[in-house]
Amino acid sequence: MTGLTRGITMAQSKWSWFSSWLCVAVVTLNLATGTTGHANTLLQTGAVVEVDQATVNQIMDVFYKADAAIAEENLEGIMALHATRYNYHGLKRADIRRIWSDLFKEYRDLGGVHFFSKIAKVGSGSNAIIEVTCTGSLSGLSKTSSLRVPIDSWYLGVHYLTLEGGVWRISGNVGETPRVLPFGTAPHPLF
């Protein structure tokens, strides 16, 4: 194991325990108190960052804009953050538009958390992809029951972004779509 690999492994191990506890605590408190939607996007202390600060700022800005668009129930604002060739396990932009539209019809005060533990750039130039390893959740108040409902959650999921029109946009997943997901996993379609 090289020094770089060992460092990355150690960073993930330390982060995993703390972030797991913190994420569970935040989600539990959020669900238990029924508070209004609130979004947090945070770069974990000790996160593995393999890009320059300008790129980190641009990536964080994408998720801050997503948080704001969700809070405002701004469907066009959310869609503007997705790449034109978005593809996540076969879901395209039209599918994501429908999912978010349905969520806004069923829930109010949507909010969530994103804890980033790694930001890495793969490739270069127009083929560059940013991989953001993230743990988080999304919840909302049901318009039917007025109860806070967990909508989506993920642990060490990877958000993929591509440079399009000079800005980073959420692009889905990279490579082949697995025919069957591993036991205990589910696709994370919302980002």
Set out the residue ranges of the language-model regions.
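Short, low-complexity N-terminal intrinsically disordered segments enriched in polar/charged residues
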Residues: 36-80, 102, 118
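Flexible low-complexity loop/turn motifs enriched in small/helix-breaking residues
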Residues: 55-58, 71-77, 81-83, 109, ...
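Low-complexity, intrinsically disordered terminal/linker segments enriched in charged
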Residues: 155, 162-191
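Bacterial N-terminal signal peptides
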Residues: 19-32
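Surface-exposed, charged secondary-structure patches
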Residues: 101-154
